[in-house]
């Protein structure tokens, strides 16, 4: 009997992989959403798990970050990641990558997982975060982005991909962090759309906040989280 294909077998077709190019709007968005909130600087070491086509890697490189690695389990991405960054890309699943890391390897300043943690069941996600925690440098952080299951606007992001295993809210993200020996340094929304649309969203959300008995903490469809070792001062 032929092997039944999984959704990951057809992920490249579903996602329509293309090599990213950096436009000024991409750089501004990266600065606003990632670089500034995460307090990144060029001398940091950065690991991106689930780097996809390499857009975040390209932004980091444009900021002068040289000590960076991007991993993804899909080997087809090796021909899609921007050519100057292909030496930074490794086609490997995260568990294998972590198992093969030398204990003597320098600790990592920032570990990025954008649109990744929701692909793991809750227990697997906890185990992954715990394994990453011990790899963090002093003042290191794990930078996440996930669909926002607490908002009606987040459902299209959560359920638009059948490989998603866990739906996160800001509160359940804090719960996951605690279970992993981490704490949430900051949780903040991903702002999408033009300034005009964002203005209208603020008005609508403000009205709903005053109307509903239990409005969500964050209305936007996705949110970021910055996690740090709970033992860190």
Residue ranges and their predicted role:
Residues 1-106, 110-114, 123-130, 190-192, ...:
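Conserved N-terminal segment of class I S-adenosyl-L-methionine
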Residues 68, 142-144:
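Hydrophobic/aromatic residues located in beta-strands of well-ordered beta-sheets
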Residues 82, 154-158, 196-201:
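Short aromatic-enriched loop/helix-cap "lid" or pocket-rim segments at secondary-structure transitions
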Residues 119-120:
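A short His-aromatic
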Residues 136-142:
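Short glycine-dipeptide loop
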Residues 144-164:
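Short, glycine-/aromatic-enriched active-site segment of Class I SAM-dependent methyltransferases
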